Amino acid sequence: MDMQSRIRRLFQASIDTKQQAMDILAPHIEQASLVMVNALLSDGKMLACGNGGSAGDAQHFSSELLNRFERERPSLPAIALTTDSSTLTSIANDYSYNEVFSKQIRALGQPGDVLLAISTSGNSANVIQAIQAAHDREMIVVALTGRDGGGMASLLLPEDVEIRVPSTVTARIQEVHLLAIHCLCDLIDSQLFGSEE
């Protein structure tokens, strides 16, 4: 297969996964946006975490809220728990890498805040511990997962929301996670500041 054919095949695989996910995920993304907007209207904040590409997604989400998405508007409170290398490495060194997010949540999280927990497999131990810490702090969890939801899915409470991408391919799951994050940002803005359509 030549390279351009391979590129077209990858584009098509991404399109197919998004089309398959669209109707499945729409109600879950809507529910997650309602949870987030309710928290923001109640003076809550968003915390976000994940590893690797999911850490990048957590930072992307946080930056879109803190700065802006596609319109001028006031900044919204969001913290990516993946960015402070001194905090991450001190917790990993003194305790365990599995606690790098949970210790931050126990310090920063308040009842009514929302944790956006991101893992393509749903099995990242430090994200699982983050969910447990969020529940201890009476926070609501929005989980971005894939595959079968992994250990994260089994921890979620009735008020939590899982956005589980119907795929087993990590790259496709990540692509849909980014789209879901953009949908959340759009829905948050439209609910708080009115639709621009």
Swiss-Prot record:
Database matches in InterPro entries: GmhA/DiaA (IPR035461), Phosphoheptose_Isoase (IPR004515), SIS_dom (IPR001347), SIS_dom_sf (IPR046348), SIS_GmhA/DiaA_subfam (IPR050099)
Pathway: Carbohydrate biosynthesis; D-glycero-D-manno-heptose 7-phosphate biosynthesis; D-glycero-alpha-D-manno-heptose 7-phosphate and D-glycero-beta-D-manno-heptose 7-phosphate from sedoheptulose 7-phosphate: step 1/1
SUPFAM superfamilies: SIS domain
The enzyme's E.C. designation: 5.3.1.28
Molecular function terms from GO: carbohydrate derivative binding; D-sedoheptulose 7-phosphate isomerase activity; zinc ion binding
Comment on bound cofactor: Binds 1 zinc ion per subunit.
Residue ranges of every copy of the SIS domain listed in the record: 36-197
Catalyses which reaction(s): 2 D-sedoheptulose 7-phosphate = D-glycero-alpha-D-manno-heptose 7-phosphate + D-glycero-beta-D-manno-heptose 7-phosphate
Cofactor field: Zn(2+)
Annotated Zn(2+) binding sites: 60, 64, 174, 182
GO cellular component terms given for this protein: cytoplasm
Subcellular locations according to the entry: Cytoplasm
Record Gene3D superfamilies: Glucose-6-phosphate isomerase like protein, domain 1 (3.40.50.10490)
Protein origin, superkingdom: Bacteria
Enzyme class: isomerase
Gene Ontology annotations of biological process type: carbohydrate metabolic process; D-glycero-D-manno-heptose 7-phosphate biosynthetic process
Annotated keywords: Carbohydrate metabolism, Cytoplasm, Isomerase, Metal-binding, Zinc
UniProt: substrate binding residues: 51-53, 64, 93-94, 119-121, 124, 174
Any single Pfam family the record assigns to this protein: SIS_2
Reported function: Catalyzes the isomerization of sedoheptulose 7-phosphate in D-glycero-D-manno-heptose 7-phosphate.
Something else known: The reaction produces a racemic mixture of D-glycero-alpha-D-manno-heptose 7-phosphate and D-glycero-beta-D-manno-heptose 7-phosphate.
Subunit structure: Homotetramer.
Family note: Belongs to the SIS family. GmhA subfamily.
Protein name as it appears in the record: Phosphoheptose isomerase
Organism of derivation: Pseudomonas entomophila (strain L48)
Encoding gene per record: gmhA
